[in-house]
Amino acid sequence: MGQQISDQTQLVINKLPEKVAKHVTLVRESGSLTYEEFLGRVAELNDVTAKVAAGQEKHLLFEVQPGSDSSAFWKVVVRVVCTKINKSSGIVEASRIMNLYQFIQLYKDITSQAAGVLAQSSTSEEPDENPSSVTSCQASLWMGRVKQLTDEEECCICMDGRADLILPCAHSFCQKCIDKWSDRHRNCPICRLQMTGANESWVVSDAPTEDDMANYILNMADEAGQPHRP
């Protein structure tokens, strides 16, 4: 019976527009993801990106933000920090924070791309060819994807309008969609997290300023404990 329902659900998803189907699949996957599987994916991304970017000047480091996964509702509050680091100096060049939904998107993008790159390298007629030569700086390209995911947040309902409101559970929506929903409901349309009051329910999402980002990156560099050697 369960398998039949699952097959029917997949059939419906297959008939949806590609963009909406991808969103539904990601939401379903994040809902069934266990904490151990999540930690495994963070470790896997570190391994995969290290292999593909071997021999390059920069690399990415994925870490769960300390304290963000301690709640019983870790899926709505957990944050993954993606940091681009210069290997020779240890200096943090860029840093971004992702929620679980954004992380799963990135995980799928990177593992899919990396599989192709590593397969191409293994079948190359020149075995000495470095897989990292496929791109000049793979870490920078991936960091650009992280920036796109965290900057261009779309409404979780219509998948069209730019999100300008974010709930405490980190799901974001455009003003038009959330106005219609909040007229009758006091919970999140995606995860159903209950909102306690009008003042706490709908929080305007403000992008960090350049000063905020600069201070954050400097703090990350200090915590890395590796001084810059010009």
Swiss-Prot record:
Compartment(s) of residence: Membrane
Annotated zinc fingers (RING-type), start-end: 155-192
PANTHER family (UniProt xref): RING FINGER PROTEIN 141 (PTHR12109:SF3), RING FINGER PROTEIN 141-RELATED (PTHR12109)
Keywords: Lipoprotein, Membrane, Metal-binding, Myristate, Zinc, Zinc-finger
Highest taxon listed in the record's lineage: Eukaryota
Main location per the UniProt record: membrane
Alphabetized PROSITE patterns for the sequence: ZF_RING_1, ZF_RING_2
Membrane topology: Lipid-anchor
Function: May be involved in spermatogenesis.
GO biological process, any: regulation of DNA-templated transcription
Entry GO terms, CC: membrane
Lipidation, N-myristoyl glycine type: G2
InterPro entries given in the database record: RING-HC_RNF141, RNF141-like, Znf_RING, Znf_RING/FYVE/PHD, Znf_RING_CS
Protein name, UniProt field: RING finger protein 141
Free-text tissue specificity from the UniProt record: Isoform 1 is testis-specific. Isoform 2 is expressed in heart, brain, skeletal muscle, kidney, pancreas, lung, liver and testis. Isoform 3 is expressed in heart, liver, and kidney.
Gene Ontology molecular function terms on file: ubiquitin-protein transferase activity; zinc ion binding
